UniProtKB/Swiss-Prot annotation:
Keywords: Actin-binding, Cell membrane, Cell projection, Cytoplasm, Cytoskeleton, Membrane. Its main location: cytoplasm. It comes from Entamoeba histolytica (strain ATCC 30459 / HM-1:IMSS / ABRM). InterPro entries: ADF-H, ADF-H/Gelsolin-like_dom_sf, ADF/Cofilin. SUPFAM superfamilies: Actin depolymerizing proteins. This is Actophorin. The gene is ACTO. Belongs to the actin-binding proteins ADF family. Residues 3-134 form the ADF-H domain.
Amino acid sequence: MAGIQLADEVTSVYNDFKLSHKYRYIVFKMNDGMTEVVVEKTAEKNATYDDFLKDLPEKSARYAVYDLEYDTPEGLRQKIIFYLWTPEGCKIREKMLYSATKATIKQALVGLSAEIQATDAGELNLDEVIAKVKTISK
């Protein structure tokens, strides 16, 4: 399991996301051979959280980063959220590989503010994500 690599595009696309605020979110997946993490999709800045949720498959695991903007009494805040999506319908081996590789991808994606691990859509509720981020950011 430790042999899974990150494609070069993972860090280059993430750097565009982080430094240039070029995308609202990025979805990453493992290639068909389960040997490398690759970029599956990038979404333009005008994409919504609902668009993001629709891009997470019902029966396959994914990693994702989301550029979350939310209001506080002090003004607008912006945080990069890392997601590990392992839905109930995905295969056990796939869940294990994604969980085992999570530390590798997180190490490459510098500047993450929070992590959300979810197995069903209810755990991805935007209000709950924002509440978690606010708690961490205090």
